[in-house]
Amino acid sequence: MDIKLTKQFQKKLELLLESFDYKVRFEKGNFKSGYCVLRDNKVIIINKYFTTEGKIYALIEIIESININKDNCPIEHKKTLNLIFKN
């Protein structure tokens, strides 16, 4: 199964991050990479003018960088996490 660049998949990624107590917000800003992660506050801000594809790639990049423990992942998100780390 490949990653589908749809709003539904974007929502799955947002819910995955929220299950680890991160807040995902879409706002305008001048981020060099298109997003900003406030690790201490567990807040993720993504440029709201990104396309759906850009938002998904940003979310995937963030998930890969924040050291999510797959063992503590809720069952409903394990499939999504495995898909991300497979690619």
What is each of the regions a protein language model found here?
Residues 7, 42-46, 64:
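A near-ubiquitous, low-amplitude feature marking generic local secondary-structure context
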Residues 1-32:
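Auxiliary, metal-adjacent structural segments of Zn-dependent hydrolase domains
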Residues 20, 28-53:
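Active-site scaffold of zinc-dependent metalloenzymes
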Residues 33, 53-56, 66-87:
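Post-HEXXH active-site segment of zinc metalloproteases
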